Amino acid sequence: MWFLFAIVSVLAWGTADLFYKKGSDPKDKYSYLKIVIMVGAVMGIHAMYVLLTSGVVYEPRNMITYLPVSALYILSMAVGYAGLRFLELSISSPVQNSSGAISGLLTFIFLGQSMTGIQFFAVGLITVGVILLSVFEQRFAEAERKENKEMVDRKYKYGAIALLFPLGYALIDSLGTFADAWVFDRGMDEMQANIS
């Protein structure tokens, strides 16, 4: 059953990425903020649904406790969506999704989580591989456009500077995940954090 849920999650994640890319209009300098607001609205609706249907007794003080973590996640989304205006999804998405490996390293280093040598090697390999994949893919895409004498879309002319957006997303999102682990280690219930 877990495999079915994993497949559904991957499909939903990929579909969401396509909608984020479609909504990132390079001509609208605020398009990424509109996406952040819509994602926040959907998450707020989800929180209200959970509150109304699950019988959880929510403690509002947890909203203040969890605010720095939420701020990191919101900032990472804004940076990631802003970057979609300048990069192809096939370049930005792998870099952004390396945040899980980075947060694994952070929890290992700072929170004393255990990690075997092989796990440590795998996390490092994934992180380096994902970043190199996007760098090489961008170079190949630029070379292909030049070879085919295609006009380079204005939004893709920023090159290496545009890679700062998905890298920024990965770093900020990994800090958010690390902060999640830290808050949970200090005793906050996951459901309280989810609603916050």
Task: Label each residue range with its predicted role.
Residues 28-38, 88-99, 122-123, 159-168:
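Cytoplasmic-side transmembrane-helix entry/capping segments in multi-pass membrane proteins
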Residues 15-42, 56, 172-196:
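Juxtamembrane helix-loop-helix junctions in multi-pass membrane proteins
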Residues 2-9, 48-51, 55-79, 158-171:
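Loop-to-transmembrane-helix transition segments
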Residues 51-63, 108, 112-117, 177-192:
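Membrane-interface helix termini and inter-helical loops of multi-pass transporters
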Residues 15-28, 74-91, 131-141:
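C-terminal ends of transmembrane helices
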Residues 10, 14, 18, 48, ...:
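Hydrophobic/small/kink-forming positions within alpha-helical transmembrane segments
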Residues 68-73, 81-133, 192-196:
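Specific alpha-helical transmembrane segments that line the substrate/conduction pathway
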Residues 1-8, 101-171:
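Juxtamembrane helix-loop boundary signature in multi-pass membrane transporters
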